[in-house]
Design a protein with these regions (language model features):
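Metal-dependent polysaccharide deacetylase catalytic core of the NodB/CE4 family, i.e.
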Residues: 73-183, 203-210, 264, 295-300
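Well-ordered, non-membrane alpha-helical segments in soluble/globular domains
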Residues: 49-58, 83-91, 153-158, 273-283, ...
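C-terminal domain-boundary segment and adjacent tail
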Residues: 32, 98, 197, 202, ...
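Bacterial N-terminal signal peptides that target proteins for export
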Residues: 1-14
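Active-site-adjacent pocket scaffolds in enzyme catalytic domains
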Residues: 174-290
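Active-site beta->alpha N-cap acidic-glycine motif
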Residues: 30-102, 166, 171-173, 320
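Structural recognition of the beta-strand scaffold that forms the well-ordered cores
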Residues: 37-40, 69-72, 103-105, 173-176, ...
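Bacterial N-terminal signal peptides
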Residues: 11-23
Length: 345
């Protein structure tokens, strides 16, 4: 009987250790350059998510157990009717509790959300238009958060915090606004409301993948200084863009707010081959001696349609990890990546 118990414990303890480390252990410094891989889910229109989309996200989790989700969850799921709300919430919590996922925040300027937060709803400008002048979006979806004042942004962030607290979603650490729109006012406000990480810097070029409409380029806050080769960086008080120096915007832990560039853009913009090539570009950066990161991103409502694409890319990354080839590649959440970036060398 005793040998049987020992054998059983030998099987259970490693699993317990893995789960404990995913959820509790602080990141450890890496001796050599690493390519970090983040996998972000964007909840844009949670009411439109289908059972098939949810199954696709569950399959990506199951087929790629090393992968770590950063769910950019959307509190609008609680301000208007969302058929799969309970199932979606259960999924993000389960991946957090059992697969080391992170639950962050993604905000689009929908009327129901703004009304609930006590913010006046506006319909202009739109980031999906040919020009800014005269542009509008009556749903608010394409209206950039940067259209609103710091005080109004603060109300939205506080309302989000209350929803997350009530639903057991925890204190969010990573933030990304709809269409990645960003400004210094926004970065200062997310830092003041407990966020440590921004996942918004977006490549404007078409070297790999498509690009947004002309009005987005005028309104988003990003320019050609952000590329598919961009690496995570501390956010300066002088600019949201890379390449600027201290003083930095500090989070409430008195450490700098860090930006995680969206190197692989988002699902509909890029092919599987695009993402693989960008991954290989970052392998080359690490071989030259610099730790770097890529970000893969998928919308909740197109998860089923994009499953094969991301399964293929994640399998490609998994194969590199399993091969033991250098440089080392590690999956990580965006907030944990920020902690790694700030570790002393």
């Amino acid at each position: 009987m005793f040998p049987l118990v020992v054998n059983l414990l030998s099987r259970l303890i490693p699993l317990w250790v893995v789960v404990a480390c995913l959820n509790c252990c602080p990141p450890q410094a890496d001796a050599d350059p690493v390519v970090y891989v983040t996998m972000v889910s964007h909840f844009d229109r949670p009411w439109a998510m289908t059972d098939g989309d949810l199954v696709a996200l569950e399959k990506l989790t199951r087929f790629h157990p090393r992968m770590r989700w950063t769910h950019l969850y959307n509190p609008v799921a609680y301000t208007q009717d969302t058929p799969l709300r309970e199932a979606m919430e259960r999924f993000v919590k389960q991946t957090r509790d059992h697969h080391g996922a992170e639950i962050g925040t993604h905000l689009h300027m929908y009327k129901s959300l703004l009304t609930a937060a006590g913010v006046k709803f506006v319909t202009h400008p739109s980031v999906t238009a040919e020009q800014v002048e005269g542009s509008r979006d009556d749903s608010g979806y394409a209206v950039p958060i940067t259209r609103y004042s710091r005080e109004e942004i603060g109300r939205l962030l506080e309302h989000t915090r209350k929803i997350y607290q009530e639903r057991g979603l925890g204190q969010p650490k990573t933030f990304c606004a709809g269409f990645y729109a960003t400004s210094l006012d926004l970065q200062n406000m997310i830092a003041a409301h407990g966020y440590t990480t921004s996942a918004a810097a977006f490549p404007t070029q078409t070297i790999y993948g498509a690009q947004y409409a002309p009005s987005w380029h005028a309104l988003s806050g990003w320019n050609a200084s952000v590329t598919y080769k961009s690496r995570p960086y501390r956010i300066s008080q002088a600019s949201i863009l890379p390449g600027h120096e201290a003083p930095f915007i500090n989070a409430i832990d008195k450490q700098p707010l860090v930006e995680i560039p969206q190197t692989c853009k988002i699902d509909w913009m890029v092919s599987a081959e695009d993402m693989k090539v960008i991954f290989k570009e970052h392998l080359a950066i690490a071989r030259q001696g610099a730790t770097t990161a890529i970000c893969l991103a998928i919308h909740e409502t197109s998860s089923e349609g994009n499953f094969d694409k991301f399964h293929q890319v994640l399998r490609y990354i998994d194969e590199h990890i399993h091969s033991g080839s250098q440089p080392q590649v590690k999956y990580i959440t965006t907030a944990e990546l920020r902690d790694r970036i700030l570790e002393p060398n």
